[in-house]
Amino acid sequence: MKNLLFACLISAAISCNTSDEKKIPAMEGTYFMNMQTLNDGKKDTKYTDLKQLKMYTGQFFMYTQVNPKDSVSAFGVGSYTANNDSGTVTESVIYSASDSSFRDDPAQYVLNITITSDGYQQVIPEIVMDSSNYKLTEDYKRSGDSTKTPLDGVWKETHSVVINGNDTTVNQRVQYKAYYGGYFMFGQYVKDSSSKSRTGIGFGTFKMISNNEIEETDLNSTYAIIAGHSFKVKIQMDGPDKYSQTILNGDGTTGIENYERLKK
């Protein structure tokens, strides 16, 4: 099922019928997924236990997901355009990962959107999984607030290290991070100490304490050690499109991460 759910997230390439009345307003915002519904032509199967957050920020989007039953995680990132006349959103994915697999070749998908009173609904009428056809419906609820910060947007990590006493280790990973409406998320694809590849994510709320410090509260994560906890993070902006962050980890190590803003 974990592979099925990931396929649902990144394979939204099939259109559904939309009437002339379906218009797409600005999609910028933060959304929690409430439910996925799969229909095999005979019955609906509903999934309400997945924890997923999605952000549309300016011209870019990002989503992160974790299954609390087994901590299997997924994320994706890319650019998007809202097509008012057709009632669709076109997403151009530049990177996605799930569990032990990743995809870094560009892919474009057209999503048909129905705006609801508190968010939106996405319907994919036909998607192939395990050689069978399904209809997929996803329901999202808007969250977040009107808070604006210099961090708002989607960022790619360019370099990061962990410092332990006199030892410095360079992280071998791909990591993205996003901020919007008082929420943050990160997604990473890493090799662990046994050289096994895995996907990790986290998302929650954040607030600016000062120009050089934020507080992040992780609501859901692949990593139990950070889920439900708050962390003070030192930040240093280098113009509007670069920043670095420094955090003292619970094990006494220090993590330093450098980011660049995604731009078209």
Language-model features, listed with the residues they occupy:
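Short, low-complexity Ser/Thr-rich regulatory SLiMs
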Residues: 82-84, 237
